[in-house]
Amino acid sequence: MKRHVIYIPGLGDRSDPLRRLGLLLWRRPGVAVTFVPMRWLDPKETYEEKVVRIQSALLKYEDRNVTLVGESAGGAVAIACYERFRSRVSGAVTVCGMNQGAGAVNPVLYKKNLAFRDAMLAVDKALPNLSSQDRATMLTIYSSNDGVIGKKETVLKGVRSIDIKVPLHMLAIGYVLFLKSSLVTKNI
């Protein structure tokens, strides 16, 4: 059975070409990857428009063997969409994800990006609705040396976690994207 990954990037749309390049390494027999751009830099695009793009990607797959993978700010989107579309999604993985704690984010960042604020509010609302069975199909990959997102915001109760210990947020994401994709593809 083919496994499908829908990759949801974090802030920093200018890095999307690099992300797409890294995702080429994720493709292997039995694994298909779809990159869904978030367009975080578009101040007019709402969180809901981002969710609609993810929903459209989900509708392309007949089976339920789809895992949402969210990176950084995309972690919040992946978890909120997992809760919202549980009937079409088999699991969620976050890579250095901002997975909870809307109040922990600097208000200046929200002022620049209302869609990110709405994603954080959505994930905080979604988390209590996830059962222990739902959480058993989730994985958080984080770095205790991230420097941007703390363990408190990324590690979720009842969800398996892997600490990659790579220094710096972007370096840790790049490590998973280019060198350790197996952390995701072997755990979905």
Please place each PLM-identified region on the residue numbering:
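C-terminal catalytic-base region of ester-bond hydrolases, centering on the histidine
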Residues: 133-188
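Short, charged, surface-exposed secondary-structure boundary motifs
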Residues: 44, 102-108, 169-177
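Short, aromatic/basic amphipathic alpha-helical patches
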Residues: 21-27, 152-157
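Serine-dependent carboxylesterase/thioesterase catalytic core
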Residues: 5-8, 16, 32-35, 49-137, ...
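The serine-hydrolase catalytic nucleophile loop
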Residues: 14-21
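Glycine-rich His-Gly loop
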Residues: 8-11, 143
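Conserved alpha/beta-hydrolase
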Residues: 22-42
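Proline/glycine-enriched tight loop/beta-turn segments at coil->beta junctions
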Residues: 1-3
